[in-house]
């Protein structure tokens, strides 16, 4: 029987120390963040202001949305300034919120939950999901070349990458439950996927871990392309959802009337951006993934397909249930308290993005 412990792969000691130190500092100062939170300002129950005063700046971490805004000239229509940040991935967004350098972040199901667990109050202000979520997965399991894993049941006794602050953790726990493997019968290797490069793919290829949830986009394709001859392969996880994406913000930004008014407008355009990406996959491939990221066109098309074909619901009932499932899966496993998922959502924004996306869906561009 394998002991369920957290362990870093060989050769990652310095990186592990840095990440562990950052997380420790974040925990240490989380109470201070709560104490310092504005005690005055716009109540979260107040209607969203209509007027954006002069000088308002929104700091946003969402590179694809930035390209869509710039490509369409939408920034010129905004009565406020957007400062774009190259910040992606739940841990980085949480750190940026804690440091007070970001107003808007994008992440999957777990990052906003984890932020609240760490004492950083955030609210979800927009949600998207796969339009074809019944047949499409955002993540698959990468299997190391010599792991001798043919089916998910073979994960028993293996080393699996685990990042408690990211959706990958939820995928691991739900998969183990679905195939009847107890957590103590595997070794969970704590390894954030956002610490740079293809960290999961490299750890798999080197044999430091046996399995890891990796994105079902170019990451998975490259992994099989580069290491398939050595026996590397991928497996789909059981049929549970992994597709939700959240726009979330610190409550301190919502307490600022000017920023709250700007967020109302920004989320409208964010909804337009989702519809635009759906309708223009080739533009996204060539303009963003080739032009900005330097990918070959074939790889760029893979990424554009992964980014697109999303739906922006006008009701958050399904989104709340989706987030609650993540809380109920990870809370007991990570020793965090149960949350009511509805409290994560700012319902004042519920229809804004969905109405915007619906207003242009299917219209000629």
Where are these regions (language model features)?
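N-terminal hydrophobic or amphipathic helices and topogenic motifs
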Residues: 2-83, 90, 321-365
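Short polybasic/polar patches that bind polyanions
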Residues: 76, 116, 177, 225, ...
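Short, glycine-/small- and polar/acidic-enriched structural segments
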Residues: 33-192, 196, 210, 216
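Secondary-structure end/capping motifs
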Residues: 256-336
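Residue-level signal for nonpolar/aromatic packing positions in well-ordered secondary structure
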Residues: 97, 155, 172, 204, ...
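Short Gly/Pro-enriched turn/cap motifs at secondary-structure boundaries
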Residues: 131, 237-238, 315-318
